[in-house]
Amino acid sequence: MVMNPTSFEQQQTEKLLNPMGRSQVTQDLSENVILTTVDDLYNWARLSSLWPLLYGTACCFIEFAALLGSRFDFDRFGLVPRSSPRQADLILVAGTVTMKMAPALVRLYEEMPEPKYVIAMGACTITGGMFSSDSTTAVRGVDKLIPVDLYIPGCPPRPEAIIDAIIKLRKKVSNETIQERSLKTEQTHRYYSTAHSMKVVEPILTGKYLGMDTWNNPPKELTEAMGMPVPPALLTAKQREEA
């Protein structure tokens, strides 16, 4: 067997000029080896095993509990409900948060290990909902207590909306890097609300209508329009004079 000296010299020259040349990957190797980065591998492991903390204070939690059933099956996302904050990395606040419950919520959040995420579910959690106008104990937004990553509006939101929020949270986790987490202990792109500019209005249920004349006696215009004479026993002194 005689080798071509010209081709051999070209190969040696190519090795000297480009010693780190790209090696040829065989077909079998390309089908059995996955190339990735440490960030992608780490984020894939975290987004595939989000463990939510069971925390519900009102009717919104019933919709979250529906995810545990076979119809929605949120186990396919790797979600495993936990009862201890030390084993959870996601807290889904579902329901009204009161002033008395606020310190307990903050304590649960602080006991969760980093990195941790928060989802605010329902109108009562986000803004106070139906209790935002006249309640003296409801917190007007859970983002006044802890930072929130995602909001799920609704009263209450359907389980499909919760699944959509989980998918968006998984996308957020997949875009994080280890360098950002090592430089900053606090997570970025989280939301704290500002003070609400609420106006004080006169209460509606004051009880003053009980003392009005029309409460016991219909007005004269109404009786004339309906053609129903009022019995004399029900007439007041002023109405008797007018009659």
UniProtKB/Swiss-Prot annotation:
<dbReference type="InterPro" id="IPR006137">
    <property type="entry name" value="NADH_UbQ_OxRdtase-like_20kDa"/>
</dbReference>
<keyword id="KW-0408">Iron</keyword>
<keyword id="KW-0520">NAD</keyword>
<keyword id="KW-0874">Quinone</keyword>
<dbReference type="GO" id="GO:0051539">
    <property type="term" value="F:4 iron, 4 sulfur cluster binding"/>
</dbReference>
<keyword id="KW-0618">Plastoquinone</keyword>
<comment type="similarity">
    <text>Belongs to the complex I 20 kDa subunit family.</text>
</comment>
<dbReference type="GO" id="GO:0005506">
    <property type="term" value="F:iron ion binding"/>
</dbReference>
<feature type="binding site">
    <location>
        <position position="59"/>
    </location>
    <ligand>
        <name>[4Fe-4S] cluster</name>
    </ligand>
</feature>
<feature type="binding site">
    <location>
        <position position="124"/>
    </location>
    <ligand>
        <name>[4Fe-4S] cluster</name>
    </ligand>
</feature>
<keyword id="KW-0004">4Fe-4S</keyword>
<keyword id="KW-0411">Iron-sulfur</keyword>
<dbReference type="GO" id="GO:0048038">
    <property type="term" value="F:quinone binding"/>
</dbReference>
<keyword id="KW-0472">Membrane</keyword>
<dbReference type="GO" id="GO:0031676">
    <property type="term" value="C:plasma membrane-derived thylakoid membrane"/>
</dbReference>
<keyword id="KW-0813">Transport</keyword>
<comment type="function">
    <text>NDH-1 shuttles electrons from an unknown electron donor, via FMN and iron-sulfur (Fe-S) centers, to quinones in the respiratory and/or the photosynthetic chain. The immediate electron acceptor for the enzyme in this species is believed to be plastoquinone. Couples the redox reaction to proton translocation, and thus conserves the redox energy in a proton gradient. Cyanobacterial NDH-1 also plays a role in inorganic carbon-concentration.</text>
</comment>
<keyword id="KW-0793">Thylakoid</keyword>
<dbReference type="InterPro" id="IPR006138">
    <property type="entry name" value="NADH_UQ_OxRdtase_20Kd_su"/>
</dbReference>
<keyword id="KW-0521">NADP</keyword>
<protein>
    <recommendedName>
        <fullName>NAD(P)H-quinone oxidoreductase subunit K</fullName>
        <ecNumber>7.1.1.-</ecNumber>
    </recommendedName>
</protein>
<keyword id="KW-0479">Metal-binding</keyword>
<dbReference type="GO" id="GO:0009060">
    <property type="term" value="P:aerobic respiration"/>
</dbReference>
<dbReference type="GO" id="GO:0015990">
    <property type="term" value="P:electron transport coupled proton transport"/>
</dbReference>
<feature type="binding site">
    <location>
        <position position="155"/>
    </location>
    <ligand>
        <name>[4Fe-4S] cluster</name>
    </ligand>
</feature>
<comment type="subunit">
    <text>NDH-1 can be composed of about 15 different subunits; different subcomplexes with different compositions have been identified which probably have different functions.</text>
</comment>
<feature type="binding site">
    <location>
        <position position="60"/>
    </location>
    <ligand>
        <name>[4Fe-4S] cluster</name>
    </ligand>
</feature>
<dbReference type="Pfam" id="PF01058">
    <property type="entry name" value="Oxidored_q6"/>
</dbReference>
<dbReference type="GO" id="GO:0008137">
    <property type="term" value="F:NADH dehydrogenase (ubiquinone) activity"/>
</dbReference>
<dbReference type="GO" id="GO:0045271">
    <property type="term" value="C:respiratory chain complex I"/>
</dbReference>
<dbReference type="GO" id="GO:0019684">
    <property type="term" value="P:photosynthesis, light reaction"/>
</dbReference>
<keyword id="KW-1278">Translocase</keyword>
